[in-house]
């Protein structure tokens, strides 16, 4: 099976609507991302429903806590059978290392463990507001390096940082990129954006795309077009 690069970000407050959308797309064409709102509303059973339909799930809960608590949450995600789970890199090396170590018993069945660097909505002024006098890109590199040194599989980063991070941290280090907008779609609330092909060419391994697919008249066709554009 080809490694699907597209991760569709589900963003629904109604489970029936979410599953109606999911039933219109093919698990061979993408993976699915479940975030905080949906997981809080619908719980682990919703993830199990997606698994029953054949989808791989990225559980996007961005855990950030003391090492013991964070690692146990990561283990719970592994027990749920998700394909990918993430933690905030700003939680530090001990937190990330504990989270990685708790997954070791799962072997090749363990989820990918990804660090979150700087949220794509954040600009330099936002970082300054929390006491960080640093450019977003510089802080991303710092946190991504810490993530790699902690033994995690990769980071979430904007497409603009992909090329730099691939060069700095190596090809095996996975880059998961939100803020992706196919040509012709609205920018939305993500500040640092790029098209799917541009992002992959820059070094992104996985592309998180939401509304351009979930709000499309024919989401399967949009997915097919994106996947086709990536094979050129």
Swiss-Prot record:
Subunit structure as annotated in this protein's UniProt entry: Homodimer.
Catalyzed reaction equations: orotidine 5'-phosphate + H(+) = UMP + CO2
Pathway field: Pyrimidine metabolism; UMP biosynthesis via de novo pathway; UMP from orotate: step 2/2
Function, as annotated: Catalyzes the decarboxylation of orotidine 5'-monophosphate (OMP) to uridine 5'-monophosphate (UMP).
Organism this protein belongs to: Vibrio vulnificus (strain CMCP6)
Protein name as catalogued: Orotidine 5'-phosphate decarboxylase
Key words, A-Z: Decarboxylase, Lyase, Pyrimidine biosynthesis
Residues at which substrate binds: 11, 33, 60-69, 120, 181, 190, 210-211
EC number(s) recorded for this UniProt protein: 4.1.1.23
Superkingdom per UniProt: Bacteria
GO cellular component: cytosol
Alphabetized SUPFAM superfamilies for the sequence: Ribulose-phoshate binding barrel
Segments forming a coiled coil: none
Family indicated by similarity: Belongs to the OMP decarboxylase family. Type 1 subfamily.
Keyword Lyase: yes
Signal peptide (from-to): none
Statement: the UniProt record of this protein carries the keyword Isomerase: no
Active site: residue positions: 62 (proton donor)
Gene Ontology molecular function terms on file: orotidine-5'-phosphate decarboxylase activity
């Amino acid at each position: 099976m080809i490694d699907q690069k597209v991760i569709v970000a589900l963003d629904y407050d109604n489970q029936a609507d979410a599953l109606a959308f999911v039933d219109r797309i093919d698990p061979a064409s993408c993976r699915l991302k479940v975030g905080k709102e949906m997981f809080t509303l619908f719980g682990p059973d919703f993830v199990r429903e997606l698994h029953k339909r054949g989808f791989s799930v990225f559980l996007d809960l961005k855990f950030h806590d003391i090492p013991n608590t964070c690692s146990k949450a990561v283990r719970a995600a592994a027990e749920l059978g998700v394909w990918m789970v993430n933690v905030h890199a700003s939680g530090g090396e001990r937190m990330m290392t504990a989270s990685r170590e708790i997954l070791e018993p799962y072997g090749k069945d363990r989820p990918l463990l990804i660090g979150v660097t700087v949220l794509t909505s954040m600009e330099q002024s936002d970082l300054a507001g929390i006491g960080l006098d640093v450019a977003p890109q510089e802080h991303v590199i710092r946190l991504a390096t810490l993530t790699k040194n902690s033994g995690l599989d990769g980071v979430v980063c904007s497409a603009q940082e992909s090329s730099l991070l691939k060069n700095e941290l190596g090809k095996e280090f996975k880059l998961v990129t939100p803020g992706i907008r196919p040509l012709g779609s609205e920018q939305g609330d993500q500040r640092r954006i790029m098209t799917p092909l541009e992002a992959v060419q820059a070094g992104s391994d996985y592309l998180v795309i939401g509304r351009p697919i979930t709000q499309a008249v024919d989401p399967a066709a949009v997915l097919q077009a994106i996947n086709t554009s990536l094979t050129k």
